[in-house]
A protein has these predicted regions:
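Single-stranded RNA-binding regions, centering on S1/OB-family and related RNA-binding modules
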Residues: 1-216
Length: 216
């Protein structure tokens, strides 16, 4: 299945002066501009490309690697603001929009924010949001105590730190379980400490902490 906002392996089906067209399956053919076409590329070859919407809102392919893909979170910097919202540098020619209704608080140019990137099906565009709890599940039923996970620090609370689990869920690291100050956006390995009665997840950030807690 071909998905927008991620890397896809697509086959070259047509050559033109300004690039090549790729078979996008149900998305029709997709242009890979000439400057991104690998040397020696021919009809029938397969290429790894990232799909996004250009400044004319046309679906286009690139071999450039963005800083984040759809379905993931990352710290990005605001480079512009206009009537539509804030625009962030994500490593591609067209900046990434954070609409005003997806901003937890007003964003400012030059500041970096942790955002979740998604494909807005209603507007058919790639967008980002600082309202992480609107997009990430806080009560995943398939996480179990002592399960290894990848964490990204999302923010501070009175109890400790909110953390993103595997780019999909939200959990909590209690301050007592954080053996050092943690930075928003920081990525680190962790473990599920416990699943609360309400289904929310408590986390640990090191094997040593987990072992010490178990020994107690």
């Amino acid at each position: 299945m071909v998905t927008v906002g991620t890397f896809n392996q697509l086959q070259v089906v047509k050559e033109v002066d300004f690039g090549v067209y790729l078979d996008g399956d149900d998305l029709d053919t997709i242009l890979l501009p000439k400057r991104y076409v690998p040397e020696g590329c021919e009809i029938g070859d397969w290429v790894s490309v990232f799909l996004y919407f250009d400044s004319d809102d046309l679906l286009i392919a690139t071999t450039e690697t963005p800083k984040v893909e759809v379905g993931s979170c990352e710290m990005l910097t605001v480079v512009d603001i206009n009537h539509a919202g804030a625009f962030m540098d994500w490593g591609l020619p067209k900046d990434l929009l954070v609409p005003y209704n997806e901003q937890q608080k007003p964003m400012e140019v030059g500041y970096s924010y942790l955002v979740y990137v998604f494909h807005d099906q209603q507007s058919d565009r790639i967008a980002a949001s600082t309202k992480l709890s609107h997009h990430l599940d806080e009560t995943p039923v398939w996480l179990k105590p002592r399960q290894a996970v990848n964490l990204q620090i999302a923010g501070r609370t009175d109890l400790g730190y909110k953390a993103i689990i595997d780019d999909k869920y939200l959990g909590l690291i209690f301050r007592a379980d954080a053996y050092r100050p943690l930075k928003i956006g920081e990525r680190l390995p962790g473990f599920v400490k416990a699943v609360r009665d309400d289904g929310k997840i408590d986390l640990l950030i090191s094997q040593a902490t987990l072992q010490g807690d178990h020994d107690l």
